Amino acid sequence: MRKRFGMPGTAALIVLAFALACTSISARPVYAADAPASSASPVLLLYDSLALSTPRAGNVETLERLFAAYGIEVAAMPVDRYAAGTLKSYKRVAVVRNAPDLSIAGSALASDLASYEGDYLQIGGQELPDRMRAKLGLKLAAAPLDSVRLDAGDYSQTLSAVEDLDYVAGASGDASRFGSLTFTSDGTRSPYALSADGYAYASYLAGGDLTELALAYAMKDWLHASGEFGTYMLIKEIYPFSDLELLKTLADRLYGAGVPFSVSVKPVFYNTDYPAMQRYLQALQYVQARNGSIVVDAPAVAATSTAGDGSLHGKMSGFVELLAANGIAPLGMGAGLFWTYDKVYASQGMSFFDSVFLEPNADGQHVQSTAASTAFVFSPFVMPFAQLQNFEQRGTALRTPLPLNLALSFDLFQDEAAMEDAIDTISRSWIPFADLKNGTHAVHTDRLTVQSSGGSLLIDGQPLDIGKHERAVDEDYAYTAAAKTSFAKLFGIQNQILMVIIGTSLAVFGLFLFIGYRRYKRKFLYPGGRHDSF
């Protein structure tokens, strides 16, 4: 047992047209990818441990999001809750071995796996079904505690001191190989993953490193997924009280750099007539006019119903319809993975969308948990752009096609300096970003349908003019309604009458003072008359 661890001028248009003509000859343009074509049968995902407080923590969730990126529903459970005969209900099974000291020998799972004839994927561990070992000709060995270099596609990364790593020491020549592991101490090199005849094995998976992408290459083959995949830019953490001027500047800079992008915006359910909300909508109109696509972010649990009273459906559809009424076409949703494992969130909050950007789970509260996830037609795997920066890129241009739809995410920047640094990094990355609008996406509410196809946006079948159409914001907006009054007109007339009476009385009183003063002077200051002549 091992120890555990602006509009261009005419000349500019001519130059641009010439450049585009040349580009069409020398390179294929980047289009938004359609949904991956793969069998939609669900996967049973079993794991022996969640590996909390270890480098492998989060790898089960990562695998769930990878399956979601291929439109596959997942039923996940720990190995110790497996019931005999469960495998018969699934054509695909994936097993994650995070704890080498937890053996499944003699268990109901081991017995069922011995006769299981469906597709099988295992990540880590040396306990394998005999069928898999024979099909792949697989020989495994325990790796020393050593740093290892992982190569996958156009990227590589050095993983430091990987504990409990089992590597492929030998395999059948018919098995497809994906990625490679090179041990620093002695230069030993082995495939990262293998796949053949419905069986696949990967040595290791950890959330937040290159193994996420490396495993996707093997999963694409194992799932028989086909189609073209794209890389998307996703800007997150956008609220009505974010720096909207910075958001507009970001849209201008990305538009000028020719980079299509999407923004994930927080929904607002109340006070949508406030000036702050009107500025929010204007900013989203501007972003859309600068070739940005709009995605509705999942609301915070506290902002929705946690009792399952059905209010979430009306709130989400109301926000979608508010956007559409203001000439904004939302094309999808962004949410944490746990939303797909909740009956209320999936049916009331996500059912409007066929495209969802699934992110790692953050703090959240379930309303009604489900054993299996809800899958979507288009669901890119979301990876922070900062994580990609940890990978070494071989060569300037990317040559190896991606194995899945990938969304590289940023939070809205704190200031313009951080934004400029990020845009400079994006420009130097040579990543061919795809435009979400070029794909086919649909959003349906009870009252309207929003669609995109081939770069066009449609609301109820009518093309949307995405040009700017800002409206003036009422700066004198009354945030509280005027109090209801009775007899206001009558009391208004009465006040006017009283003012006239008081004014007349003051005038008469002043006249009497003047007359009295004159009489006082004549009687007491000059008795007998004035004697001012000599």
Where do the protein language model's features map onto the residues?
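A glycine-centered loop/beta-turn motif at secondary-structure junctions
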Residues: 41-43, 89-93, 118-119, 137-144, ...
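Short, charged N-terminal beta->alpha structural module
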Residues: 42-73
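Metal-dependent polysaccharide deacetylase catalytic core of the NodB/CE4 family, i.e.
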Residues: 42-49, 123-130, 134, 258-355, ...
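Short alpha-beta junction capping motif
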Residues: 47-48, 88-133
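A short, well-structured beta->alpha microelement
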Residues: 64-89, 384-396
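Active-site beta->alpha N-cap acidic-glycine motif
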Residues: 206-286, 300-302
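C-terminal domain-boundary segment and adjacent tail
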Residues: 218-227, 232, 252-271, 355-368, ...
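Cytoplasmic C-terminal tails of single-pass
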Residues: 522-534
